[in-house]
Amino acid sequence: GLLIRAFEEIQWMREEQISLSASFDASVYAWNHGAVHTLKEEQAAFITAPWELNSRELEPVFEACRREGLPAELIVYGRAPMMVSAQCITKTVKGCSKCPSLLWMKDRTGARLPVQNHCAFCYNTILNPLPVSLHGCADSVKRLAPEGLRLCFTIETGEETKAVLNAFAAEFIRGENAEPPFTEFTRGHFRRGVE
């Protein structure tokens, strides 16, 4: 199947006569029951809840998914994409290296932002400097009753990935109180939502 990150990709699949299943990522906003219904009509295999909704706003989305018989997952760990740039930072600053790598840039507050370059298509994804983590929120997550939980690894080392997986498995699978292997993180919009 394909992971759809922009609704226009569905039309591309039709034009190219691609008959794979389509799953919709968090960037294809399933903000309400109408959006969930539309995604179901588009033959979605599953959806990923948007990063931007808080726990109260997610409740009707997951309820709509259950009514539609559409599996839905919730991202419980990962660095949220803050921006996708249409130009490559490396190419602009020092010329194209044709080598995918992790870059860093500073924002106006001095925070270091990780930047992934995607050489095949000459664009960058600027990530949140802190990972979103719902570790410690198992009760709130279970109330939402998503069909799946997603952990998104981007810049973590193998060792860091293993430690994060172990901490989330302890809390969400075994029901244990486990300390997360990181000290700096954000809850994202889970507690506050979009203004």
Model-derived segments and their meaning:
Residues 1-195:
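Active-site pocket-lining/capping segments in soluble small-molecule metabolic enzymes
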